[in-house]
Regions:
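Active-site cores that bind ATP or allylic diphosphates and position pyrophosphate for catalysis
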Residues: 96-199
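N-terminal Rossmann-like or analogous alpha/beta NTP/dinucleotide-binding catalytic cores
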Residues: 1-114, 180-182, 198-199
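A short, hydrophobic C-terminal helix/tail in secreted or cell-surface proteins
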Residues: 200-205
Length: 205
């Protein structure tokens, strides 16, 4: 088995709650049990809401709980690396610009549900013409970006659940970059990942 590395990656946009605490505890216990390392990674990708005061409280809470970390990192320190990867993915056509407003996306979601269909993104942005894009930008719209999933099965062997499989066609292309250019959790976490165990179900799906 590879050297075990686990991590607790809170977003400093608020105070810790019971869910955060449980996640930190499970990761710390697993690292302790198998002689691995437990890392604290500050996920400060949300530029507007991240605050140092929340970081300080998170550290104090972990120390009070006795959950001592062996190393610490922060996502914002790696933005240059994330920008490099983003540029490559855009060039490869794996990240694409979308101009829908939140209201338009919500309308699409409700319409799909009303028809008994899964509320996955319809990839309308891939059909936008140069004229469409010029029109949106003239309206003052700024694009957000999605990661284009490739067709086929995504599968792996989970130590708890056994073989897990998802069909990419049944999943929405995830939004990875906000309108203001900041990264959502998905992209930096995948680029930065070097952890061997314990992932949240919603992260994997």
């Amino acid at each position: 088995m590879a050297k075990v590395r686990t991590r607790f990656a809170p977003s400093p946009t608020g105070f810790m709650h019971i869910g955060n605490t449980r996640t930190a505890l499970f990761n710390w216990l697993w690292a302790q049990k198998l002689g691995g390392k437990f890392m604290l990674r500050i996920d400060d990708t949300d530029k507007q809401r991240s605050k140092k005061e929340y970081e300080d409280v998170i550290r104090d809470n972990l120390k009070w709980l006795g959950l001592v970390w062996s190393e610490e990192a922060r996502q914002s320190a790696r933005f240059e690396r994330y920008n490099e990867v983003t540029a490559r993915l855009k060039a490869e056509g794996r990240i694409y610009a979308c101009y829908e407003t939140p209201e338009e996306l919500e309308f699409k979601r409700k319409r799909a549900l009303s028809k008994g269909l899964p509320p996955i993104y319809d990839r309308q942005a891939l059909r936008n013409t140069a004229e469409d894009i010029a029109k949106y930008e003239a309206e003052g719209r700024k694009p957000h970006y999605r990661f284009k999933l490739l067709p086929g099965e995504i599968k792996w062997n989970d130590m708890v659940r056994g073989e897990v499989c998802y069909e990419a066609e049944k999943l929405s292309d995830p939004i990875v970059i906000r309108e203001d250019g900041s990264f959502l959790y998905h992209l930096p976490s995948v680029i930065a990942v070097s952890y061997t165990h314990l992932r949240a179900h919603e992260t994997l799906s």
